[in-house]
């Protein structure tokens, strides 16, 4: 699934193994969901799309709200920076289960941890009549330890900046830059076998989106984006007293870009047709070592026959795809519609899930040779 927060990619969308969303409902303005076919401005995943947007803070007066719960406590502040021109919204949530379990006499219970915390922030500025600037941020982390088991920590950090510009009465644009980071850590605290295992993926992206309203029944949408992916799939660092060896799977670097154009036209009061093309490109870059194996046998260390070494930023493999999409919608009622569509989708980043533990210990892998 493609999950986004204020135009930025989110790699992990839940707390408590899926029981709670990472998105604080107090800070959410709207949610856009597509199942199956979706517009050409979305891509990179082949399932569904969910785009969440922060709401703007109150630009007229300060307000404070919050609540205490058995699972989660929350707090939200919002108010004007400059009245009627700029505002802020800051919210946070946290659990306090550690305070309930640390006093237990049973070491299995006292060592139990199942906590999470997250913070949301949005600042918006009306620069002038034609320009608005938005800054959005999210930081969240889960921490889990079952008795004498390993301590696991994981979380997202996201920051985005967006400029909304009105060119004229018919043309609008959004320019966005964002940073998205997802990390996972597992910690063994036993002295003889202590270690810290880490996994991380970081994205740096620039994107632009344009909307041209030819008339109320005819809209053109077009834009482009480029994303730099840095993946560190796994590293294990032994403790001082540990007899284990350090293991490092290295890192991967990739550049993903796309451009799109779509045409939405209202054929009648109830029938709308949307057609478009999306052009995508993905390049896996060095530094990296690519192993060649004996054909027809299982890929093991003993089956390696040669190694190709690539220098930093050297191209290892490039993919290019064109994705046509067509949707015909018939509006049955105000709340229901019938859709027929054709979509071509592609996914270059792949998630390797761990089915043994319920924690979010997913590892991401880039397409390559």
Task: Kindly give the residue locations of the regions a language model identified.
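N-terminal periplasmic accessory domains that precede
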Residues: 18-21, 33-36, 41-64, 75
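Transmembrane beta-strands of outer-membrane beta-barrel pores
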Residues: 35, 54, 70-72, 81-83, ...
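Hydrophobic, lipid-facing positions within transmembrane beta-strands of outer-membrane proteins
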Residues: 46-48, 62-64, 71-75, 117-121, ...
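Outer-membrane beta-barrel strand-turn architecture
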Residues: 56-58, 81-83, 125-129, 165-171, ...
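Transmembrane beta-barrel wall of Gram-negative outer-membrane proteins
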Residues: 69-94, 107-143, 152-173, 179, ...
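Short acidic/polar hinge/loop motifs at secondary-structure boundaries
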Residues: 8-34
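Outer-membrane beta-barrel signature, preferentially recognizing the C-terminal barrel domain
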Residues: 152-154, 158, 162-166, 207, ...
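Signature of Gram-negative outer-membrane beta-barrel scaffolds
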Residues: 221, 226-332, 348
């Amino acid at each position: 699934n493609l999950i986004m927060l204020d135009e930025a990619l989110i790699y992990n969308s839940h707390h408590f193994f899926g029981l709670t969303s990472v998105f604080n409902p107090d800070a959410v303005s709207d949610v856009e969901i597509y199942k199956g076919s979706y517009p050409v401005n979305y891509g990179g995943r082949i399932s569904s799309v969910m785009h969440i947007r922060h709401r703007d803070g109150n630009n007229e007066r300060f307000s404070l709200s919050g609540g205490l719960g058995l699972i989660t406590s929350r707090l939200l502040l919002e108010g004007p920076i400059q009245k009627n021109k700029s505002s802020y919204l800051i919210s946070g949530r946290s659990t306090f289960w550690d305070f309930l379990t640390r006093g237990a006499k049973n070491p299995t219970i006292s060592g139990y941890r199942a906590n999470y915390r997250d913070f949301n922030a949005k600042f918006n500025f009306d620069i002038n009549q034609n320009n608005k600037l938005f800054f959005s941020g999210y930081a969240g982390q889960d921490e889990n330890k079952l008795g004498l088991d390993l301590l696991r920590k994981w979380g997202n950090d996201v920051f985005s900046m967006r400029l909304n510009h009105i060119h004229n009465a018919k043309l609008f644009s959004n320019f966005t830059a964002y940073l998205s980071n997802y990390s996972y850590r597992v910690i063994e605290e036993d002295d003889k076998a202590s270690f810290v295992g880490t996994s991380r993926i970081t994205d740096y992206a620039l994107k632009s989106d344009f909307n041209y309203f030819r008339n109320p029944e005819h809209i053109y949408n077009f834009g482009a984006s480029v994303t730099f992916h840095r993946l560190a799939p796994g590293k294990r660092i032994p403790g001082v007293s540990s007899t284990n060896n350090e293991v490092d799977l290295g890192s991967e670097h990739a550049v993903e870009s796309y451009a799109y154009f779509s045409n939405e036209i209202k054929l009648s009061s109830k029938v709308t047709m949307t057609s478009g093309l999306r052009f995508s490109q993905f390049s896996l870059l060095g530094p990296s070592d690519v192993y060649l194996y004996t054909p027809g046998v299982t890929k093991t260390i003993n089956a390696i026959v040669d190694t190709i070494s690539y220098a930093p930023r050297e191209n290892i493999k490039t993919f290019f795809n064109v994705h046509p999409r067509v949707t015909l919608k018939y509006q049955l009622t105000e709340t229901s519609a019938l859709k027929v569509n054709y979509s071509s989708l592609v996914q270059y980043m792949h998630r390797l899930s761990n089915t043994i533990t319920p924690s979010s210990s997913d590892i991401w892998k880039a397409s390559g040779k």
